[in-house]
Amino acid sequence: MMNKKNNKYKSDSLDSKEDKVDLYQDAMISNLISVNNKSTSDSDAKKPTENRIELLKNAYKGGTLKPMIDFDDHNTETFMDKRITKNLLDARSLFLSMGVKLIYIKSGTTGHTFKAISRSNKNVVFAVKVCAYPKDDYGGIKSSSRPENVEIRMLKILSYFVVNRLTPHLVLPIGTFHTDIEKFINIPEGVIDLKDEKNDMYKKFIERYHDGEFEKFVSVLISEWCNGGDLLDYIRKNYDSMTLETWTVVIFQLLFTLALIHEKFPAFRHNDMKANNILVEKTDNKHEGPDKWYRYSLGSHVFIIPGIGIQIKIWDFDFASIDGIVENKKVNADWTKKINISKKKNMYYDMHYFFNTLISKRFFPQFYEGGVPQEIVDFVHRIVPEEFRNGSDNINKKGRILVDVEYTTPFKVIMTDPLFEKYRYNQYYFHPQRNMAPKKSILFQQGNGSKQPVPKKSTGQKPTKKV
């Protein structure tokens, strides 16, 4: 069972816009006092994550879909269970029983993405990812090390961090099943416009099917829907209005979550951590505002991060692995080894690939053309020195580092880089009844922290008296 330590994530509201460096820490300490006094705001504390979980629970009602996660069991063992049950279901009947209609979004080389919208409540939306099994590539369709199944296992394992309110920055799965591939070959006319060039991938999928490249069944994954698209698309559309604070918070959300995962699973590698494999959720104005802040805790370290109206969620784990826990036949293939996609522990790899692809001209050409604040350019150069940037002999054409070096880690970056300096605070805070830190904190704590008495700022030393 995992030792949770003090890794927690929650939020609060500030009443003024004074100097943020001082005010963030005061608000944090004040909020912790209110939590341990069991303030009346506790009833609202869980709303953002509780709402996510409640939405997912409701997806099972009235249908035949089996839940992937037991949201009421927070133990590590529950999420580590290797068993993934994929019943053979009729997709049309299932979605009818769930009361949703499917809207086609896009296709990839081996599958499709749909948006499932509730017929009774248009605000209830899910994502449906359909993956075909290429024949003879990675073994039988029930193999746990096939990339299609690895992705599902990884989503289940990593959902531990969301359910236990350690980070919100991961997509939660709902359920998975097998269905006949022909359900997605003979999609009704009008659902997909085959004359539209953006749907060429779907036509290639059909061609591959008729060439006999796919197995008879497809894997269907139902998960949370993120309303902001992928991060790369979001940046391309909004970079001209993204402030230094916005960039800093987005980067922090990613690096904090990687550091958190590495703490429990040091050998975790996403292996395809680029901006278009990260999704964006535009947050509800009721829970987000200019004076909203979030407290992130990692061990004995605390960060106070302002709300920016969006939250990223890491996604797309078909290249991922955790050596000794989640084996991936795609990662072990000869072609991936040649480009340094590996299961070997390296906490720098994913972070490097994210930034080195982001700054490339094929991804975001505006990066070096005034599209980001200079502070962000300087930050990326500190994380990705010239010898590990595009154009170096150490990098392949698609931005992957070819040498096995752990130049730095996400944890080291959030702890030492000046970009995050004003957001870093000591974890040691004062318990109102006992001279010790409380063992539990609450995700998304709501309230006006400044209304509580604010003790002197912590210097990191053990207090000599109760407050």
Curated annotation (Swiss-Prot):
Family annotation (Pfam families): PK_Tyr_Ser-Thr
Compositionally biased region (Polar residues): 458-467
InterPro entries for this protein: Atg1-like, Kinase-like_dom_sf, Prot_kinase_dom, Ser-Thr/Tyr_kinase_cat_dom, Ser/Thr_kinase_AS
GO molecular function ontology, one term from the record: protein serine/threonine kinase activity
Gene3D superfamilies (alphabetical): Transferase(Phosphotransferase) domain 1 (1.10.510.10)
Parts forming coiled coils: none
Principal EC category: transferase
Residues that hold ATP according to the record: I105, K106, S107, G108, T109, T110, G111, H112, T113, K129
Chain intervals for the UniProt region annotation (Disordered): 443-467
Protein known as: Putative serine/threonine-protein kinase R400
Species the sequence originates in: Acanthamoeba polyphaga mimivirus (APMV)
